[in-house]
Amino acid sequence: MLESAQLNKEIYQMRKDELRGGVISAEQFTQIYEEYFDRVYKYIYYRVQNQYEAEDICSQVFEAVISKYDHFSEEKAKFDVWLFAIVRNAVTDYFRKKKKRFHFSLDSITDLILQKPSPEELAIRDDAHQALFHALAKLRDKERNILALKFAASLKNAEIAELIGVSESNIGVVVYRSLKKLQKILETGRFKDE
């Protein structure tokens, strides 16, 4: 146990020494990229609903990881929380620049879900996705963002709470109520109104 703590301390010190010049090693970046790319991309895609924009934002996020890695501190926050703060800020900047609230583009959503569905399956799936996205549009921005962090980015309630700055129980309540609200919207067909 003592050896493990000493080893972690040595690794942390090596990392601090490497970062004095503000440079992340290729191995560190590769490990981060391979471990987090899917979660980051899915969260971004969920929010912007456009494959090409999501890819651009994703590359900006990983560029920011390289340039801001020397600012990361394990004492302040877990790496996941730090990374998704960058991701969330990048998505916010995207919407601010585009001056749009929520845009629906279903041209490539099937790429995230299945490899090669049949035309019939595509038609059924597109209808279901369209209904879901219209129902999601009825939610408040905060609710959509929390659901995206929970389901698209696969963050735990505690990580979302730390990222947003609210209690873990508050996140649980928002997730539960948002899902109930979505269920009610979909069951009543209220998403068809607009």
Outline where the language-model segments fall.
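DNA-recognition helix of helix-turn-helix
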Residues: 143, 152, 158-188
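Arg/Lys-rich amphipathic alpha helix in sigma70-family domain 2
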Residues: 71, 85-106
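Structural recognition of an alpha-helix C-terminal capping motif at a helix-to-coil junction
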Residues: 56-63, 77-89
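Amphipathic, Lys/Arg- and hydrophobic-enriched alpha-helical face
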Residues: 33-52, 67-68, 136, 185-188
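Internal acidic/polar
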Residues: 5, 11-12, 101-126, 156
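N-terminal module of bacterial RNA polymerase sigma factors
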Residues: 1-39, 46, 70, 194
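Sigma70-family region 2
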Residues: 22, 49, 62-77, 97-98
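Short helix-capping/turn signature of helix-turn-helix
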Residues: 36-38, 47, 138, 148-155, ...
